[in-house]
Amino acid sequence: PTAADQVLIDMQQAFRKKDRVRLAQLLPQARGHALEPWAAYWELRARLEDAQASEVDAFLQRWAGTYQEDRLRNDQLLLLGQRRDWSRFAAMHPAFRMGDDREVRCYALTIAQIEGRAPQDAAAVLRENWFAQRDADDGCTHAAGELFSAKALPAIDVWRKARLAIEANRVRAARDAVAIVATDVLPQVTQLNDAPTKFLRAHSTAPG
């Protein structure tokens, strides 16, 4: 590889190692390279949790229309959702072109529910995304909690998620679902590790 190409290779390796210092050192050397958008993405993504909103906005403006722009928007939307920064999420979400992140969809559904504009098929939208998530996730779990609290999601759907998670050997996801629908049995939820089928059979008829 050329010297310029080696810079990109080194940056990719530094990104995988989460080496922020190395990324910052190498970024100036990537300027003008055909893959500079990736270099800029790796450098900012590695420190996104600490980045200023102005830095994120500047990146999105500079690389508008690129894959990396929308990829970072996706990352930022997930971060804003985790932080419950609904106003900034709502402002950024309409520009998200890929729209293929289930957790982002669930955060958007949460906002719609909070603002009283959830679609009539909100429960179906939630199920489609939540049930497809194998691992525990904050976005769809939070949306499920919001919809369940508003009586827009039946308990049977939450228990179904718990069963699906157990079948996939995803105990944390199952525990998160149980926490929504039956907090009274949470002290016993450790049984999910030892006898998950027995636990669900005993509690899946719990009121709620």
Which residues fall in each region the model found?
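Extracytoplasmic and endomembrane cell-envelope/extracellular-matrix remodeling and assembly machinery
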Residues: 1-64, 69-208
